[in-house]
Amino acid sequence: MTAGAGGSPPTRRCPATEDRAPATVATPSSADPTASRAVSWWSVHEHVAPVLDAAGSWPMAGTPAWRQLDDADPRKWAAICDAARHWALRVETCQEAMAQASRDVSAAADWPGIAREIVRRRGVYIPRAGVA
């Protein structure tokens, strides 16, 4: 999330968009750089489904109707769980898009050949005589 200009609410950036920096979110994997950051929507869905089923229906998190609910109202927690489920779906689809883009770039050219050509050209440099 990044702070908006002029005190506006923070905005989220999708890690799958090329012109934006990936979201920096503190996660357990921050402590272990080798840990997977893959997000599974299905795992989140299975975890929150009982809460959502028990609540029946709920307003969208953050809306005026949601803000008016008492903090002890199970529909308020259900709305937060539903928002978490939507967030997990968004992150999972962005991760899939990034992985596909990586595969597309990898297949787009003969990258080892391009690297060899760059190295070969560096050895052909001819220094120019200085102008007196």
UniProtKB/Swiss-Prot annotation:
Domain of life: Bacteria
Pfam families named in the record: DUF2742
Family to which this protein belongs: To M.tuberculosis Rv2656c.
Lineage: Bacteria, Bacillati, Actinomycetota, Actinomycetes, Mycobacteriales
InterPro entries hit by this protein: DUF2742
Organism name: Mycobacterium tuberculosis (strain CDC 1551 / Oshkosh)
Protein name: Uncharacterized protein MT3573.2
Annotated stretches, region: Disordered: 1-34
